[in-house]
Amino acid sequence: MLWKITDNVKYEEDCEDRHDSSSNGNPRIPHLSSPGQHLYSPAPPLSHTGVAEYQPPPYFPPPYQQLAYSQSADHYSHLGEAYAAAMNPLHQPAATGSQQQAWPGRQSQEGSSLASHHSRSASLIPHISGLEGGSVSARREVYRRSDLLLPHAHALEAGLAENLGLHEMAHPIEEVQNVDDAHLLLHDQTVIRKGPISMTKNPLGLPCQKDLVGVVMNPSEVFCSVPGRLSLLSSTSKYKVTVAEVQRRLSPPECLNASLLGGVLRRAKSKNGGRSLREKLDKIGLNLPAGRRKAAHVTLLTSLVEGEAVHLARDFAYVCEAEFPSKAVADYLTRPHLGGRNEMATRKSMLLAAQQVCKEFTDLLHQDRTPNGNNRPAQVLEPNIQNCLSHFSLITHGFGSQAICAAVSAVQNYIKEALIAIDKSYMNPGDQSPADSSKTMEKMEKHRK
């Protein structure tokens, strides 16, 4: 509506100018010679140009030369020449050559009518400002608010940001984005997968979300059942593998890859075996990166699950306790040290010291609290020594510490038998000669045979 008012004002001014020029004997358009040709509406001012989105119909059909409309750099051109000059006189576009040729008489009249334009525009500015809101809202599709106020756009945005507090809101948003990016960078850094996984139901039947940030939701859950490797065909037994055990196999010190873990779990080799295993582990919250390299040397114990390794250690302890020939070894090793009371006393003191050392060693191993199977006992030892014992136990899948305890127990049984033999010899009369003692030893050997 604003540009219509502007055109009406300019039309009245042009009619007055044409009337003045005709009264002085100077016609408005001198090169028209045809009497039947009618006069057309005056041309728009030189500064009035259209926009790319809306092309108004030309005011002057043939034989007049048609104006070449171009995109103006003036952002106030839709308000008209007078108002654009009053608002921003530094942004007036220069007249093109075609405009100067089409309207030669108009240029001579610009200077005379400029003063009257400014005076009338000053009186119309209050009315136009009142209509500005409606006109701009009606032409939102053609002009944006930032385009109309382009010279002051940065200052306006700064003022809005200051009044609305947008500059304070931008910093928390950026911090949240940085935290999310930093959280995404943790991918493949640990065995436990970060972030929430699929919904499951707890024992009460209520859905709960596994938000795995450093822990596995249910470590005691059975992941699969694995047949034993060392059992006979007639007594094949299966061992349950828990989620916690799988996590220990993927964590240091072993860091098994998909191929080795599939062998431990007795999974048949297939084309997509590694991918299916990774997907199954991902469902329980464990991360197994593709192309991973193992960290520890592979041994026969690597192929055993913890249940079978512990079973093997218990059987080994039973065999050591029941079948190891502790008495025969003690008698054989004690015979050379029965020459005299002093020698037997020295030997006895050495055996007592060894017995004390073995007792301290086994007591330390019995205090090992490395998690195994479903057992997660509380730590008793200091963290530095417990970490070392846990490293050995994890490498051997729980077999190592129990097997060493069984072996040291066999050594302790030998020491007990050796002390008994020395005590028997010490209680005998000490007047025996070396020859008699040698004969006694020969008799003992024959008796053993």
Swiss-Prot record:
Cross-link named Glycyl lysine isopeptide (Lys-Gly) (interchain with G-Cter in SUMO), sites: K10
Induction or repression: During retinoic acid-mediated differentiation.
Positions of post-translational Phosphoserine modification: S251, S433
Record's comment on post-translational modification: Sumoylated on Lys-10; which inhibits transcriptional activity.
Compositional bias per record (Basic and acidic residues), positions renumbered to this chain: 439-449
Swiss-Prot/TrEMBL GO biological process terms: cerebral cortex development; dichotomous subdivision of terminal units involved in mammary gland duct morphogenesis; epithelial cell differentiation; epithelial cell proliferation involved in mammary gland duct elongation; forebrain neuron fate commitment; germ-line stem cell population maintenance; hair follicle development; inner cell mass cell differentiation
Polar residues composition-biased segments: 95-111
Coiled coil: none
Subunit architecture: Binds DNA as a dimer. Can form homodimers or heterodimers with other AP-2 family members. Interacts with WWOX. Interacts with UBE2I. Interacts with KCTD1; this interaction represses transcription activation. Interacts with CITED2 (via C-terminus); the interaction stimulates TFAP2B-transcriptional activity. Interacts with CITED4. Interacts with MTA1.
Entry protein name: Transcription factor AP-2 gamma
Annotated source species: Mus musculus (Mouse)
Lineage of the organism: Eukaryota, Metazoa, Chordata, Craniata, Vertebrata
Protein encoded by which gene: Tfap2c
